[in-house]
Each structure stands twice: as structure tokens, then as C-alpha cells.
Amino acid sequence: MAIADNCKDLLEVDLTKCSISSQSISLFWKKGINTREVRIGQCALIDDSAFPQSTNNQSLSNYHYSITNQPTIKHFEVLRYIDLTSCTLITDEAIKRIITHAPKVRNLVLAKCSNLTDVAVKHISKLGKALHSLHLGHVANITDESIIVLARMCTRIRYIDLACCPNLTDSSIIEISRNMPKLKRIGLVRVNNISDISIISLCDRYNQLERIHLSYCEKITVDAIHVLVSRLQKLTHLSLSGIPDFRRPELQKFCRPPPKEFSDHQRQVFCVFSGKGIHDLRNFMVEEYERKKRSIFFEDYSPTSINNGNDHDYLFNSSNNNANDLLQRISSSPSRSINDSSFGNLLDENDVRRGRHNRLLGALGLSSTSSPTNINSNSDDQLNRRNINTYYNR
């Protein structure tokens, strides 16, 4: 209280882990109008009463308003950073009050504020383009409903952390990808409902994204990460700990070593790529895909009709093309439609089919360089075409 009375020009206040009351914090709202940063994380006694109450006669266009029998409360026009980590007593009402009196906050840390709901996130959305960074990790009650609103209103967010928000789905990540063109970092640790659809949608931000945290998102596959690292050339950090598909030795060799203080279990599931590891992983995945693409045998695919030799590209119908299956699942999603071009070389299905076709023709004595036109005009090729039909029918 003495600090609030005598140090009215404080620019930063850090009371993290202090046994400070809500009454003391409320004094800063009444007197510390020049404060730019406030850190009161892990202050277990702080509740909604720490923040000035809104009234009906309040107007955001005014710099102050009067409350009956209380000192004048002024708007914190210069307040840019608020950290309320683990303030478990605050509710949606506290967030409403903060946003009302500090309408230009850029960085808001609300991790582990377990009582917050979608209502709080919708209040945060009112910050609009002023908001650059938002931490909502372990705020387990929030859903797609509020995150979609946030994504559409706060379009200048550079960093968002949604770790351990179990109710979120692909819908939230798709909206974030579509509406946050400046996004550089995203935390999705243990957001278990997201799938490859979310990962592919993040490729829309290929010019900006630098750090992605996806640990323990067990529905994510290697195919999706292949697309991600191929598209995101600025990516410098990718965490995939706890995802079964990435425990393979051929992928683990590109991971950085786990911290020494980790337990045996943590070391076993640790999978984080950074710096040169990202570059090497990208090269490995591209080379591995090309190798598999070259080694596909026609026995793995069922032939379709020859169509009188006029259809060069539809001799085969893929039955186990993972990349094509991924495209079909994403394209059929009611909330997302992605063009083939988003996948680069990964989904160049025609090349794969043409390669299989040529290998089959070669095995049956027909030149792999023959075009459909040549096949129709050359009698020897016509004979071999009949041999193909015989091969299928025997």
C-alpha cells in the first residue's frame, strides 16, 4: 500500500508469489496510472475485487469516471503487459474489468487461471488489434466458440498458447491459421482433439511461423509433419514429445538431447527439433518420400478399366497412398477445404500413377515412353495392350 501511495510513477510492478491482498492491488488501479507492466502471478489471495468494478455510466471514450463514495478510477492507457498466472480465484468478471480499464493491453498471461471460461475470452477479444500475445494454457473450460471469436477479432496476435485446453478441436486451429497472418508461435501441447487437419491448416502461415509446440497431440501423423516442415521454411522449433509416430530411431536422431534433469520416462518420450535438427529433418523427410515414391510396386494397387487406351493416368486406383488419404480426409472436412497445391510435391498423384503405369508397361514388354496416342496407332503396342488385359483377367 505504501508503494502505491508514494511511487505513483512506477513503470513496472512485479509482485509474483507475494502474499498480497486484493485490496492492495486495487490501489494500483486508483493511483498507478503510468504503470506499463504488472506481474502478480501466483498470488493466491487475489480475486475479482482486486480490479475496479464497471458501472453503467462508464464510457471508454472518457479517461475517468466517478464511483459513488470511491476515488476516481482512471483508464490505464499505457498498460501493456499483465501477468496473472495461477491466480485461481479470479473469474470472467475480473477479465471484464481489466479489459474495460486497460483497453490497449498487448500481452496477457492467464495461464492456469482455471475458473475462466469462454466469457472471459470473448471479453479479451474486445482488445482487437492491440493484442499481440495471449497465454491461455491450462484454462481447460474454454471451447472453440470463444477461440473462433478471438481469432476473427484479434488478428495481430504473434503468440498464442492453448496448451492443455482439451475442448478445442481443429475448428479453432483453422480459424487461427486463417485470421492471424502475423502468427509466429503457437502452443498446442496436449490439445488432444486436433488432428492432421490442424497441422495442414498451419501451412497457410508458412511465411511467419517459427515455433510450434505439439507434444502429446497423439492424433498427428508423420505425413502431416512432412507437409509442415516442407512448407514452413522459417520454422526453428518443433516439439513432438509423446507422439508415438515420432519415437522411430530414424527420426529421433535429428532431435536435440533431452535436459539432464528429465526423468527416464521424460527422456524416453522427448522429441524436440530445433535449429539444424529442423533442417536435417526436412531433408530426410523429403528424401524418404522420394525414395518411397520410386519404390512403389504395381502389385500394391488395383487396376481399373483401360478405357480403350485413351486414359494414361487412370490405369491404377491407389489403395494405400497415405498422402492421398490425408488429402481426402481434409477435403471432406465440413470446416476446411484445401487445394492440392497446398501440399507441394507430396500429393503429386499423377506423377506417382504415371510411374507405376510405366513400370507395368515395361514389365510386359511395352515401352514406358509410349504415349496414349502412340499406343493407339502402333499395332505392336496394341498387341501388348491386349496382353495387359489378358494379364488382368487371368
Predicted feature residues:
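Conserved nucleotide-sugar donor-binding catalytic segment
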Residues: 14
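C-terminal capping region of solenoid repeat domains
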Residues: 6, 23, 27, 31, ...
